[in-house]
């Protein structure tokens, strides 16, 4: 799309919400149309630009999407699974597109998203980073060449405030590898090890999780054999990389038909 796309950001007062506001401010083809916080938040009525540190934007934080129906084209949501489902329902009823960066959805919630996406365009990705999405392509190649001959482990680290584990990105890494190898991740995944576990089953894909300090996001996939190992690692040093990816997704999504899309499609990597 050549013109500006108007976005609304829910969870505007959180760490990611403020970063999204800042990112929107700096994007040539994006304009912030609305910023939303939960009812009762002390931030309602605060200027969104001042909250994000980019100066006054004359866009006050509101406590309901109903007040912003005519102010945006695409909703961007990095909140929580239950809230994201509510927001997507609202978008369907008001014919708005939606970018979902929330992680931690259960199976039933994913089914709800699939159903809603039949009625409105949705981009959902556990990680909006360009580098991470390129990493998934590299994992396909590594799995094709080395996967059946190596032990595969996925290690991820995030800040102390992250609520779900393993991260959505780590799970996606496992899904990419398992699919390439013709395995079912639900059956071959091992989440942490403790006690006498016995020898390692070569068919398993292990997951290890670190939660510490202010880690933005670090992910490593290890393909280990006797005598050598390959590690594919992505490290994020700023949330801005995720925010910029979300803006790119919003700009792309506004011209798409109803359906559920991912960042691979946004970036043309499929």
Curated annotation (Swiss-Prot):
Protein's name in the database: 4-hydroxy-tetrahydrodipicolinate reductase
Catalytic residues, chain numbering: 158 (proton donor/acceptor), 162 (proton donor)
Pfam families: DapB_C, DapB_N
UniProt subcellular location: Cytoplasm
Keywords, ordered alphabetically: Amino-acid biosynthesis, Cytoplasm, Diaminopimelate biosynthesis, Lysine biosynthesis, NAD, NADP, Oxidoreductase
Documented EC number(s): 1.17.1.8
Species this protein is from: Shewanella oneidensis (strain ATCC 700550 / JCM 31522 / CIP 106686 / LMG 19005 / NCIMB 14063 / MR-1)
Broad EC category: oxidoreductase
């Amino acid at each position: 799309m050549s013109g500006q796309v108007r976005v609304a950001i829910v969870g505007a007062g959180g760490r990611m919400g403020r970063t999204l506001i800042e990112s929107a401010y700096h994007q040539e083809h994006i304009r912030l149309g609305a910023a939303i916080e939960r009812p009762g938040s002390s931030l309602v009525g605060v200027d969104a630009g001042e909250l994000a540190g980019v100066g006054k934007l004359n866009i006050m934080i509101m406590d309901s999407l109903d007040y912003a129906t005519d102010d945006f084209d695409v909703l961007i949501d990095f909140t929580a699974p239950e809230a994201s489902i509510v927001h997507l329902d609202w978008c369907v009823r008001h014919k708005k597109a939606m970018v979902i960066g929330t992680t931690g959805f259960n199976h039933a919630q994913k089914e709800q998203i699939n159903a809603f996406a039949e009625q409105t365009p949705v981009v959902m990705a556990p990680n909006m980073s360009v580098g991470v999405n390129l990493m998934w392509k590299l994992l396909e190649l590594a799995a094709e060449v080395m996967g059946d001959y190596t032990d595969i482990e996925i290690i991820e680290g995030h800040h102390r405030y992250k609520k779900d584990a393993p991260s959505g990105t780590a799970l996606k890494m496992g899904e990419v590898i398992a699919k390439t190898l013709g395995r079912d991740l639900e059956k071959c995944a091992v989440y942490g090890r403790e006690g006498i576990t016995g020898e390692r089953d070569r068919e398993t894909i292990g997951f290890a999780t670190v939660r510490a300090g202010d880690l933005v996001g670090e992910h490593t996939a290890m393909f280990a054999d006797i005598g050598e190992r390959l590690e594919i690692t992505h490290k994020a040093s700023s949330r801005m990389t995720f925010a910029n990816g979300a803006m790119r997704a919003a700009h792309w999504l506004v011209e798409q038909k109803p359906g559920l899309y991912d960042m691979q499609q946004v970036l043309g990597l499929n």
